[in-house]
Regions:
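Short linear capping/connector segments at secondary-structure termini
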Residues: 111-120
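Amphipathic alpha-helical packing segments from all-alpha helical-bundle domains
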Residues: 72, 119-144, 154-158, 166-169
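C-terminal peripheral helix-coil segments that are non-catalytic and often amphipathic
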Residues: 1-8, 133-144, 169, 174-200
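Hydrophobic alpha-helical connector segments
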Residues: 65, 78-105, 156-160
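Short, basic, alpha-helical segments at the C-terminal edge of helix-turn-helix-like DNA-binding modules
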Residues: 67-75
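Helix-turn-helix
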Residues: 2, 16, 20, 24, ...
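All-alpha amphipathic helical-bundle segments outside canonical DNA-binding/catalytic cores
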Residues: 89-90, 126-127, 143-161, 178-182, ...
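A short secondary-structure junction motif
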Residues: 28, 73, 102-110, 138, ...
Length: 200
């Protein structure tokens, strides 16, 4: 099976102006700015309230849609890095190095915006499933090509795909000697090195 995951697209009704507004909102969230209502955001961005409601029906959905778009753009960067290699295990290493940036300080500002939104769960679940499936496909390919040992690829995919989010937990963060991103990259390397076939 080829390593391919289809990313869902934004509504085809969104035009260039809507995407520009989402870029502006992304920039706002990136700087740690907030807004209390859709009207407040419209004033800050100096646009009509109608334009915002054409993108999403509520403040919560607008935040979820924007963060979803940020994660998909980051996912494309990870896919591009992965596709520079022909070896499945090299693809996996490249993908995870970029994917683990999603628990870095910049992305933490975005994910914090979702912490109190119940409507964000389907989107977060979608991205987790996307990453897990991609990792499993790459592990399966690596096993077929004898690049890795005989392992449970599903369990390993769940582990590798969930490291970043696990270490981003506030309960664990204070006890880490490194950032969640660096810790995730370190353990990713240990795990992948441990499952690689030994060179004769």
């Amino acid at each position: 099976m080829k390593s391919q995951v289809v990313l869902s697209k934004l509504s085809p009704q969104l035009g260039k102006r809507h995407l520009e507004v989402m870029d502006d909102l992304e920039s706002m969230l990136d700087k740690g700015k907030s807004f209390s209502t859709m009207s407040d955001l419209a004033k800050q961005l100096k646009i009509s309230l109608r334009t915002l409601y054409e993108i999403a029906p509520s403040k919560e959905e607008l935040i979820v849609t924007t963060v979803d778009r940020v994660l998909k753009k980051h996912g494309k960067i990870a896919m591009d890095a992965m596709n520079a290699h022909s070896s499945p295990i090299k693809k996996l290493e490249s993908f995870l190095t970029v994917a683990n940036q999603a628990v870095g300080p910049r992305f933490e500002r975005f994910t914090l915006s979702l912490s109190s939104l119940n409507s964000s769960k389907p989107m977060v679940d979608y991205h987790e499933q996307y990453i897990t499936e991609l990792i499993k496909n790459l592990l399966d390919e690596a096993r077929i090509k004898n690049e890795i040992k005989e392992i449970d690829t599903q369990a390993t995919a769940l582990l590798l795909g969930g490291l970043g989010r696990y270490f981003q937990s506030k309960k664990l963060f204070k006890d880490l000697h490194q950032t969640p991103e660096k810790t995730s990259n370190l353990l990713t390397k240990i795990i992948i090195d441990g499952i690689k076939m030994e060179k004769s």
